[in-house]
Amino acid sequence: MRVEFDRRKFVQLLGVISAEFGLSGKTTTIAAAQEPTHYRSAEISRFRTETINRKNFVGIQVKPFVWMDEGIDKALDTLQEKGNVNTVFAYTYDYDPNRTTQGGPIPLPDHGKYGPAGKLRTGGAFFDYDQKYFRNTSLKDFRSPDEPGFNVITAVAPKMKARKMDFFAWDYNNAFPVMMQSIPGFTEVAEVDVYGRRTTSACFNHPDYRAHLTGKIESYLSQYASEVDGIMWGCERMGPIDNMIGGGWATTGICCFCDFCTAKARTRGISVERAKLGYIQLDKLFQAAAKHERPSDGFFVVFLRTIFEHPEILSWNMLWNDSYHDVRSELYGTAKAIAPKKPFGFHIVQNITFSPFYSAVDNYAKVAEYSDFLKIACYNNAGGPRMSHFVDRLCSTIFADATPEDLQPFYYKVMGYEQASLKNIFTGGLTPQYVTHETKRAITDTGGAVQIYPGIDIDVPSSKGEKHTTPDDVRAATEAAFSAGANGIVLSREYHEMWLANLSAAGETTRKIFG
């Protein structure tokens, strides 16, 4: 099946999305195609009306190598019989270099195979694509060498359809140095930090990178129109302030100060020079905190003084996050122009549940304006040590005057959590109430306009001394999600990490809930 769409309407539609969401950065051609406000609202409402969402949604994320290691039919048998899975988020584009290896820190569960020791995966596309979708970008050669000759879409999707399952392309775009080095031209689209150094993260304002991202969406929905039932897009990136605080999702550099970002800043009336000066001052403060060199007025007071004297710090942080919103809305518009009935949604990084700074700028309500569903990473077992580490980072930067134990009561109050002490959540994880809280928050913030799919923690990797998943944990988290009003769940993080007893607990629980 081949899908054709009107290019003029496509450009017009991107203008509709841009104007409705109040996002900047589109070209003058797109801006000129904007329609009256009443038409824009009706058009966006139509997207949601036309989108076909599966009832009793149970999804799972599956890496490309799984299909080769376990066999496609056997893996699908396991997913259906044990997990009650009806939708697979199959990685079609991935960055992750790691596999479970013999003698490694993460044990192989009771299925699958060990990966080769000492060999990092390169990442890239695990499907074949027509170059015509990438005519407007220099990033054309990105087929992964990891599983040569294996096209996950043509190999897996037909077998899933025969079982009445849905195949969702999982387009995962995290920053990864090996991909930056292996994909021709990727270094040219990299972010530039405040000191003028290129990093390992692509810039959302670089037109080549944006055309690359858009080309993949066109390829999934046009070239593979009969195979792909929906798309989930993800990129676990943060703006400069959250990156400076640090933690598990931090990327290299205080960014971005490339030519495209500085030009965009000037159109907003932001002084590039003062923004740089402010971030350099903030960097010096956090470096002093790392050395326990407390200024006479204290770390928090000097932090406030720095952002008051250099409000461009906050303006630049918003510029980065607005650009992130802008790209995602553009991808949504592309998808809806081609296949309005197919769901297009986003993976939401778990930091939105930890960081008040990240949650303030990448909130559920804003992302819901340009999506059909949100998959929220609310992994409660892994969330314990992750939250504990984040509070440690706060007390190593902005709140370096305090200890984590000092900050914990205030932090819990601000974030609305009722959890155990940091020491106890590190070893015992977070309770199912955390899943309930985040599910309800997402539903409330989005006004029920989009489907909410909480990610259920099933053996998300943990370190020695941290909480490990049990079947009872899975049952409790699954029940918490649905009792809070979730439209479905995504068994997380990866199928190849899950022990079958825990996967079965999810299947048993959803069968009971669905009746």
What are the language-model segments listed below?
Residues 3, 24-55:
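C-terminal segment of N-terminal export signals and the immediately downstream linker at the start
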